[in-house]
Regions:
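Bacterial N-terminal signal peptides
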Residues: 28-38
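Bacterial N-terminal signal peptides that target proteins for export
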Residues: 4-30
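Residue-level hotspots at or immediately adjacent to binding/recognition sites across diverse folds
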Residues: 2, 44-385
Length: 385
């Protein structure tokens, strides 16, 4: 399936002149910049008589490296995802991988686990997959067809009851679908998903897409208008602490869930660039983004301190390791951050190519597994000389 473009679920007249800029920023955040030639070929092939939402991923030749975009640890194993529905599992800390059957052939960009059994994968064509066996098998919970039907039904019922906001949302959906190459699919890419231990969670994506679930993803309700994101900025990252969720986005957007109000409210951060991720720890909130920018707050976002990482490329991951955080950049630079003092220690950079994501190895605390165009690779965490 060829995605119909990223102009979905947002006020088209407000951002028509920024479409190409937004598209480029999303591709950067989704860690797909260097994958564009490959993905163009993939989608051109897939467009001929196939539907990526209904066609399972093809099984690759064993031992042949394939691009990996996201990676996550689950128990003593690792799961990675990539283009054309790729799902892989490693039981030896990332040194070897075996492909896992995938029910779709859409591009997959992120994988998360809430415990050793339950995990979720998100990607293009509004795909959301779920596993209940630690990543051994995956089922579709949501896709672009189901999402379109959900939004039309959800806002349609409220518009009939006189809800003006719902009526506006229906018009936005209609405008997006009128130009869609796949008129029955809302192909907004999902970029992150996260659940707490109660089964409450959110999925976020391009142009302000956000959905909420109270039953581990079995059912969903749209929250697009329940955020301080009227400009429909892309939402890139999620984190949660003690039932409070945080979401990051472009142009310095950071939002915190206010449970009693039932909406995400914006927090002011002294930076206007894109934030790709957020980490919520006890007594410490961190956001990371473009050009090595990392900010920390000890009062839940009221005041901020810039952490001088000394890095000049975008931070793609913050990995907890031995009481510290390892900040990993797209260019392979790394630093360790002490969460108590915010002191920064330089680490040995890794020369492996552009990094899309990173996870701690499942077998050694002095190793990371990084997602690369050439596949997942194990690298050492070592102090700089």
């Amino acid at each position: 399936m060829i995605s119909p473009g990223l102009d979905v679920i947002h006020p088209l007249h407000r951002r028509a002149d920024t479409g190409m800029r937004s598209c480029r920023q999303w591709l950067c955040a989704a860690a797909l910049i260097s994958l564009l030639p490959l993905l163009a070929t993939i989608r051109a092939e897939a467009a001929v008589g196939s539907d990526s939402l209904n066609v399972p991923a093809a099984m690759n030749d064993a031992g042949v490296p394939v691009p990996v975009i996201g990676v996550a640890q689950v128990g003593g194993a690792l799961v990675s995802v990539g283009p054309r529905g790729l799902i892989q599992r490693s039981d030896d800390g990332g040194h070897s991988w075996r492909q896992v059957p995938s029910p779709v052939s859409s591009d997959l960009v992120q994988v998360r686990f809430s415990d050793e059994r339950n995990g979720w994968i998100v990607g293009h064509d509004s795909v959301l997959l779920h596993t209940s066996d630690g990543g051994g098998s995956w089922q579709v919970q949501l896709d672009g067809r189901r999402l379109l039907a959900l939004l039309q039904d959800w806002y349609g019922q409220r518009a009939e009851d006189g809800d003006a906001v719902a009526d506006d949302m229906l018009r936005e959906i209609s405008m997006a679908m009128n130009t869609s190459a796949t008129p029955d699919v809302l192909a907004a890419p999902f970029l992150d998903v996260l659940f707490d231990d109660r089964g409450h969670g959110f999925v976020v994506g391009s142009f302000g897409m956000i959905l909420h679930s109270r039953d581990a993803g079995a059912t969903w309700e749209p929250w697009i208008e329940r955020t301080d994101n009227d400009r429909r900025m892309h939402l890139y990252g999620l984190d949660e602490r003690h039932g409070v969720f945080y979401a990051t986005g472009e142009q310095g957007l950071l939002m915190r869930l206010e449970p009693q109000a039932g909406r995400f409210v914006a927090l002011e951060v002294p930076y206007g660039g894109t934030f790709f991720g957020v980490r919520a720890l006890d007594g410490l909130l961190l956001v990371h983004g473009l050009r090595g920018n990392l900010f920390a707050s000890r009062d839940d976002g009221q005041q901020w301190q810039k952490v001088e990482t000394g890095l000049d490329s975008s931070l793609v991951s913050l990995v907890e390791r031995g009481g510290q955080l390892v900040a990993v950049s797209q260019g392979g630079q790394m630093v360790a951050v002490n969460p108590n003092t915010l002191a920064v220690t330089s680490l040995q950079p890794v020369r492996v190519g552009e990094i899309y994501a990173a996870s701690l190895s499942s077998v050694a605390e002095d190793m990371l597994v990084v997602a690369l165009f050439s596949g997942a690779r194990v690298v050492a965490i070592a102090k700089a000389d």
